[in-house]
Amino acid sequence: MTNIRKTHPLIKIINHSFIDLPAPSNISAWWNFGSLLGICLIIQILTGLFLAMHYTSDTMTAFSSVTHICRDVNYGWLIRYMHANGASMFFICLFLHVGRGLYYGSYTYFETWNIGVILLFAVMATAFMGYVLPWGQMSFWGATVITNLLSAIPYIGTTLVXWIWGGXXVDKATLTRFFAFHFILPFIITALVMVHLXFLHETGSNNPSGLISDSDKIPFHPYYTIKDILGILLLMLVLMILVLFSPDLLGDPDNYTPANPLNTPPHIKPEWYFLFAYAILRSIPNKLGGVLALVLSILILMLFPILHMSKQRSMMFRPLSQCMFWILVADLFTLTWIGGQPVEYPFIIIGQLASILYFMIILLILPTISLFENKLLKW
């Protein structure tokens, strides 16, 4: 009798993706974040679905509907905070996943990498629109400030902003369309994830050494399924500690005040996971320049395959590049901190220096060091 797992048209796809998939024998815990991101996406879609059952996307009732979810719906508070903090866990896993890709040279699979960058943009767009939905002060003013940046686009900017708003200001039309987009985007993300995996399975996974591992492969199940389950348990542990002990730790107190177009909050800032990009945006005095820097801060990831100058793929055996990589990580932490600070001395200058350093390391220092390391090894 033939095994249904290997013959059934649908089940064999799952089999080739998660069971009989040949995987390198030496991939470390850094390779767990792909599956963790998948779990995060599932959590977000499920909690989001249940929230959408009780949420109303109308300026008059949006804030009250969120309060109603937290007070009156069975375990509504749990669903709401799992969704809000699930987004933070999603971004933590995303940043670590991208960082792993940079460190171990996974960007040389450039189709997989570029789809990944598009996914990052899609997740950021989804998170931004989701933050607008509770219709608190920071929701309203965040939406106003960020959408207003598009007015910096020459010629069509002002028209574009009014078109996105659906009126003269952020209002009912804006909230309704943001809810519609926030609902549809995760499903588009799911489709992109499938494309991401399809491209990855064309080449197989990279590994810490960056060397070809075709001669030493092991089946994904049971080795990496059990390893992924451990990762998922740890992810759920951290998420539930956050949700049950300090659900508002990463949120903004201003968002517990209903949106008021007549009263601007003293410090408008996005959620923590956007602060590094927000700091880069603010460090350039020109509006259009700031918007370009903001977009390029993420888009620059697509240049990594072109800027790879080393004869080795991974940074595992390249101490100078490793050193520069960790300086880049420290720089991103600095930018995140600056993004949450008011626009005044000394934060302005620190932000500007950190922004310059960010682009310098990626565009100039890392490729130069890679060439220097090739010379040291007489390659």
Swiss-Prot record:
Bridged cysteine pairs (disulfide): none
SUPFAM superfamilies assigned: a domain/subunit of cytochrome bc1 complex (Ubiquinol-cytochrome c reductase), Transmembrane di-heme cytochromes
Binding of heme b b562, residues: H83, H182
TM annotation in the entry: 33-53, 77-98, 113-133, 178-198, 226-246, 288-308, 320-340, 347-367
Free-text remark on how the cofactor is bound: Binds 2 heme b groups non-covalently.
A single BP term in Gene Ontology: mitochondrial electron transport, ubiquinol to cytochrome c
Any one Pfam family match given in the protein's UniProt record, by short name: Cytochrome_B
Gene Ontology annotations for the cellular component aspect, listed alphabetically: mitochondrial inner membrane; respiratory chain complex III
GO MF, any single term: ubiquinol-cytochrome-c reductase activity
Compartment(s) where it occurs, according to its Swiss-Prot or TrEMBL record: Mitochondrion inner membrane
Residues the record lists as binding heme b b566: H97, H196
Bilayer topology annotation: Multi-pass membrane protein
UniProt keywords, alphabetically: Electron transport, Heme, Iron, Membrane, Metal-binding, Mitochondrion, Mitochondrion inner membrane, Respiratory chain, Transmembrane, Transmembrane helix, Transport, Ubiquinone
Positions contributing to a ubiquinone binding: H201
Cofactor annotation: heme b
Superkingdom of this protein's organism: Eukaryota
Keyword Membrane: yes
Subunit structure: The cytochrome bc1 complex contains 11 subunits: 3 respiratory subunits (MT-CYB, CYC1 and UQCRFS1), 2 core proteins (UQCRC1 and UQCRC2) and 6 low-molecular weight proteins (UQCRH/QCR6, UQCRB/QCR7, UQCRQ/QCR8, UQCR10/QCR9, UQCR11/QCR10 and a cleavage product of UQCRFS1). This cytochrome bc1 complex then forms a dimer.
Job of this protein: Component of the ubiquinol-cytochrome c reductase complex (complex III or cytochrome b-c1 complex) that is part of the mitochondrial respiratory chain. The b-c1 complex mediates electron transfer from ubiquinol to cytochrome c. Contributes to the generation of a proton gradient across the mitochondrial membrane that is then used for ATP synthesis.
Similarity comment: family membership: Belongs to the cytochrome b family.
Further comment: Heme 1 (or BL or b562) is low-potential and absorbs at about 562 nm, and heme 2 (or BH or b566) is high-potential and absorbs at about 566 nm.
Name of the molecule in the record: Cytochrome b
Species for this entry: Tamias dorsalis
